[in-house]
Curated annotation (Swiss-Prot):
Subcellular location: Preautophagosomal structure membrane; Vacuole membrane
Transmembrane segments: none
Native source species: Saccharomyces cerevisiae (strain ATCC 204508 / S288c)
Biological process annotations from GO: autophagy; cellular response to potassium ion starvation; cytoplasm to vacuole targeting by the Cvt pathway; macroautophagy; pexophagy; phosphatidylinositol phosphate biosynthetic process; piecemeal microautophagy of the nucleus
InterPro entries: Autophagy-related_protein_14, UV_resistance/autophagy_Atg14
Any Pfam family matching the protein: ATG14
Keyword RNA-binding: no
Keywords: Autophagy, Coiled coil, Membrane, Protein transport, Transport, Vacuole
Domain-related comment: Coiled-Coils at the N-terminal half are essential for interaction with VPS30 and VPS34 and autophagy.
Name used for this protein in its record: Autophagy-related protein 14
Designated gene of the protein: ATG14
Family, per entry: Belongs to the ATG14 family.
């Protein structure tokens, strides 16, 4: 073929049909292909030999390598040397980094050792301070326990003197008046109907005096105080409703003191059941003797109005437990000088 521009001969190009159908063209091309394959095999063998010698050059004789001066082998050897130098440089740089890290860690360890020594000294000082503080706390607790025992002994002594002063005693031969205070009957819901109003009011006054002294010794504040001025019996003119109200306030104060002494629980109590079991005089006597009392728990606290209605029911009903009208009982008719005492 000739170039249509420069008219020089160029490579001949045949179509696929001519190559497959022309025997002369097919044979020539096949022979060329066989020659090329043979040349490639020879070149492949040489390349493999050169590569093998280049990889194992440290095991070959130096003189033999000098006799054979193949440029490909020399290039490969130089490439391998450069690669080894590069690896050596990387290893050297890595070693330097590790040395710097080891040096910094050594400095950090030495600083930590110094801090540990300082902390040990501080800990020893702190331990000594804590031990001294614990000793002081223990001494303070011992002193507080001793003071508490002294205060408790003084309180018990004062309460015993108070009991002896008011002559609180339990009578064995009287069912309606089982307890006495200052040689007078302790008021209760059972004997409220049979005692004269003057005796009832006088008994409540004495119980109020005792409760006031008792709360002063215990150093507690009561919910109610006795604000009514004391008068002689023949001049007393309070109504029965006022006496009942004072009695209810007295019951509330007694329960408050019993809660403080842990004779009854601080939770809401079934006060009607408690009064049915102990009555007012029983509550007062157990408070004086500091005896624990059994009681039932309820969900709500009793109010003054609820207690007032309940006390009226108990006083109006001699059998205690049956419904009755909620009116105050009529006072017993007494003379101005009708005053008597129960002597145990």
């Amino acid at each position: 073929m000739h170039c249509p521009i420069c008219h020089h001969r160029a490579h001949v190009v045949y179509c696929a049909h001519c190559i497959n159908t022309s025997p002369s063209l097919l044979l020539k091309l096949k022979l060329d292909l066989i020659l090329l394959k043979d040349e490639n095999k020879e070149l492949n063998g040489k390349v493999e030999q050169i590569l093998n010698e280049a990889m194992n050059y440290d095991q070959l004789d130096i003189k033999r390598m000098e006799k054979k001066k193949d440029p490909l082998m020399n290039s490969l050897m130089k490439l391998d040397v450069l690669r080894m130098k590069k690896n050596n440089n990387l290893i050297r740089h890595r070693i330097e980094q590790l040395n710097e890290r080891i040096y910094s860690k050594r400095n950090h360890i030495s600083e930590l050792k110094v801090e540990i020594d300082n902390y040990k000294c501080y800990k020893v000082g702190t331990g000594t301070d804590k031990l001294r503080e614990q000793v002081e706390i223990s001494d303070a607790k011992n002193k507080l326990a001793q003071v508490s025992k002294i205060c408790e002994s003084a309180r018990d002594y004062k309460l015993n003197l108070l009991n002896n002063w008011f002559v609180i005693q339990k009578l064995q031969d009287n069912f309606q008046i089982p307890f006495a205070i200052a040689f007078q009957p302790l008021i209760s819901l059972k004997n409220f109907r049979i005692l004269p109003l003057a005796i009832t009011n006088d008994s409540i006054n004495i119980m109020w005096k005792y409760i006031s002294f008792f709360s002063d010794i215990l150093m507690i504040k009561l919910p109610y105080t006795n604000k009514i001025c004391e008068q002689p019996m023949f001049e007393f003119s309070d109504s029965i409703q006022t006496v009942v109200q004072r009695l209810i306030k007295l019951i509330i104060n007694i329960l408050q003191i019993c809660r403080h002494l842990k004779l009854v629980p601080s939770t809401p109590m079934d006060i009607p059941w408690l009064l049915d079991q102990y009555d007012v005089d029983g509550l007062f006597y157990n408070m004086v003797k500091r005896n624990k009392m059994k009681c039932r728990s309820v969900s709500l606290y009793w109010t003054f109005g609820m207690l007032y209605s309940m006390v009226l029911d108990n006083m109006n009903n001699p059998q205690r437990g049956h419904p009755a009208r909620r009116t105050a009982p009529p006072p017993t008719v007494t003379g101005p000088h009708d005053r008597w005492y129960v002597v145990g």
